[in-house]
Amino acid sequence: MKIGYFGTPEHSAKLLEALIDSQLTEVLFVVTNPDRPKGRSKIPEPGPVKKKALEYNIPVFQYESIKKEKEKALSDFGLFSADLYVVFAYGSILPKEVYAHSTLTSINLHGSLLPDLRGASPVQTALWKGYTKTGITIQYIGEKMDEGDILLTKEVEIAPEDNTGTLMDKITDAGIESILQLLKTYDGKPFPSVPQAHDKATYCGKIKSEDRILDWSLKSEELHNRIRALYPDMIATTTFRDKRMNILKTKPSSLSLEINPTPGKLKRLDKKRLLTQCGDGRFLEILELQPENKNRMTASDFLNGFRIQEGETFG
């Protein structure tokens, strides 16, 4: 099968490489976001999918807005005769003229069990909501985002210690396995599919920068889920002694709850464990954190270096 591939970040590059190595497909071209400056450098750098495509000498197309540049895109893609377009974390919505351009239209790998968690942040939102399982969906692309018919789904378990980084790895592995499984069934005809139960749809939006700021008046479980949902891409943050403090890794504490809690109050336990009181009276144990302008550290290192005082708080 001859395909065009649309994607941008690291996990999408992993799927691209799996498709190339599978020998089930011939990747004719890749479409990815334009090069962007990374870190402190002002020099634009190619993203992971572009790097992987160039490694295999696959033609790469980049558009600032594929919607506005769709005529050019269609002209570019017209140089090839792709059977199918495969999309995974491209970063832009494809106009109908583009996703319907290939012989068998286009399929998308989505990081949830549709119709649950349609939208931009299904992996983060599953963690944020405290899900114990999620999954992937391979769907046809339709006119409305994430509403296309379903070809295949696969469940993924969420472990208590998972964060967005580790869960995204699981999602990607499940997606690779499922797409290769699907491609093995190709007989020259469109893949069979079933409509979504649109009346059961739920939605998730983009994670905003203000979502990073922790409100210690929330329940400890809510805060723990938010922290792992934000890691490693955005990082939850609070303040300590009027400076920023990033909270990287936590776990709920079994310490008995207190009446009339002081949200954000710090508690030292066994001289090397750090707990923060939350709005429900329970404690959240801080495992790893990063003070402003310093490297990440364990709670034990933080306690040794900062020597917290009675009554001090985060936030």
Curated annotation (Swiss-Prot):
Catalyzes what?
L-methionyl-tRNA(fMet) + (6R)-10-formyltetrahydrofolate = N-formyl-L-methionyl-tRNA(fMet) + (6S)-5,6,7,8-tetrahydrofolate + H(+)
Q: In Gene Ontology terms, what is a biological process of this protein?
A: conversion of methionyl-tRNA to N-formyl-methionyl-tRNA
UniProt KW keywords: Protein biosynthesis, Transferase
Q: One GO MF term, please?
A: methionyl-tRNA formyltransferase activity
Which InterPro entries does this chain map to? Fmt (IPR005794), Formyl_trans_C (IPR005793), Formyl_trans_C_sf (IPR037022), Formyl_transf_N (IPR002376), Formyl_transf_N_sf (IPR036477), Formyl_transferase-like_C_sf (IPR011034), Met-tRNA-FMT_C (IPR044135), Met-tRNA-FMT_N (IPR041711)
> Into which EC class is this enzyme placed?
transferase
Any one Pfam family here would be Formyl_trans_N
Domain of life, per UniProt, equals Bacteria
Positions contributing to (6S)-5,6,7,8-tetrahydrofolate binding = 112-115
EC number(s) for this protein?
A: 2.1.2.9
A GO cellular component annotated for this chain's UniProt record is: cytosol
Q: What NCBIfam families does its record include? A: fmt (TIGR00460)
Tell me, in a sentence or two, what this protein's role is. Answer: Attaches a formyl group to the free amino group of methionyl-tRNA(fMet). The formyl group appears to play a dual role in the initiator identity of N-formylmethionyl-tRNA by promoting its recognition by IF2 and preventing the misappropriation of this tRNA by the elongation apparatus.
Q: Which family does it belong to?
A: Belongs to the Fmt family.
| PANTHER family with a match to the protein in the record | METHIONYL-TRNA FORMYLTRANSFERASE, METHIONYL-TRNA FORMYLTRANSFERASE, MITOCHONDRIAL
Q: What is this protein called?
A: Methionyl-tRNA formyltransferase
Organism (species): Leptospira interrogans serogroup Icterohaemorrhagiae serovar Lai (strain 56601)
State the encoding gene: fmt
